[in-house]
């Protein structure tokens, strides 16, 4: 991440700029790079700037990021143009412990993880020294994001010595191969020249009365579902609830735009089963076009089909409901026998580089044995996925059932420690906390395990989300007593109405007191 460039309007420390209470630009860039890269370099101008970034990095407090991130100073700091991006690329190649480097400026606000994935896939095993991205605006190669290999370092050093600082010209001289960003080209042209540009792009942040930053909205597109999971409907779907509400595509688009004006950067589409809604796929595309950085869907995966089309539409995260790897237990819970189909979708998503999370609800009498749980854990640890065990939560229609079947997260901790898993600390200084899940990782194996314990360990203090029901109403708390109507006349009215209602968001739920709110079944809200 190139942090040392001068900017007449944002200054030389632009990477430390935090738009309207958000995280600094450099922290955002590191988050977008995510866990796919074993080494993260912040290339800065000099030792003084390095110290400022070092202090800011410590405030993030993520041990994993700290272990993988190094701050290095520009090798050409005494050159005539020490802030030239080409010098930063050369420095990265010289300092990196790996032979391949992806470079991007700290203020490249339009860059997404998908752009970096396409660069990596496009480069593959090709022998070219560098790869550039094609811009929709310029109809040619743009300097960043770009991929560079070690052999390019000699040419870059010579260009700096000659006073030739253009990265685009360096790409051309080295015969850079072009990588097409596909449907994501327009994002690369996002403007970040001024603080006004940045504030307009990121939106005006929303805080609740308890100081929690809200940046994540969950849309229940429909109450309809093509499964009948036991924990959702232990006695079947009641006759009085046969009508299955569904948001219209126009309502979804209006609300997506409204929440972007409030600085929301993550959206999740849920149900029921969201893919039974005819506008689900278009909603993903709309969210990408509006600038949401994280676009997720929680699904049983039966109707996903080819994951590639979802990736091209803008999907960045796939959450799959999978309660057992045992076909008999799976069918007993879901009333469905297509386990292999779901596993195939998961494997394809992994191959495509989409972030995959597996949601598993344990029932003591069905899939809650230590053998079944251990099998799920071992399967997940062997893959770059996060398997999250969710404590069965009570609703109006499953209270007695939940009490008898619930497996507490604390019961799983011995299985995790036996496999050498250690707890992952969240980034305490970042507004992008890890949410309700307490995560565990292994020092060698790629998978992670998460425990979501709403009953035994209240996580309301980390709440960063709002929910929209399939009836188009705002749910301020998953277990709140009231849903609120929203004025859907325009994105502006949506934003204004949500900002007005946020003052009534409660501090926490009261499940332990038997107050389950107005949720009848999880089919109506999607979790």
Which functions belong to the PLM regions below?
Residues 396-516, 521-523:
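Accessory C-terminal segments flanking Radical SAM cores
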Residues 203-218, 228-230, 261, 437-448, ...:
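N-terminal [4Fe-4S]-dependent radical SAM core
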Residues 2-167, 172-189:
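Nucleotide and nucleotide-moiety/phosphate-recognizing core
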Residues 209-249, 262, 478:
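Canonical Radical SAM [4Fe-4S] cluster-binding loop centered on the CxxxCxxC motif
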Residues 151-203, 443-473, 480:
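Active-site oxyanion/phosphate-handling segment shared across diverse enzymes
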Residues 249-269, 273-390:
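Radical SAM/AdoMet-radical enzyme domain recognition
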Residues 52-77, 283-288, 367-386, 445-453:
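Short, electropositive alpha-helical surface patch
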Residues 8-12, 138, 155, 187, ...:
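A short acidic, helix-capping loop that chelates divalent metal ions and anchors anionic groups
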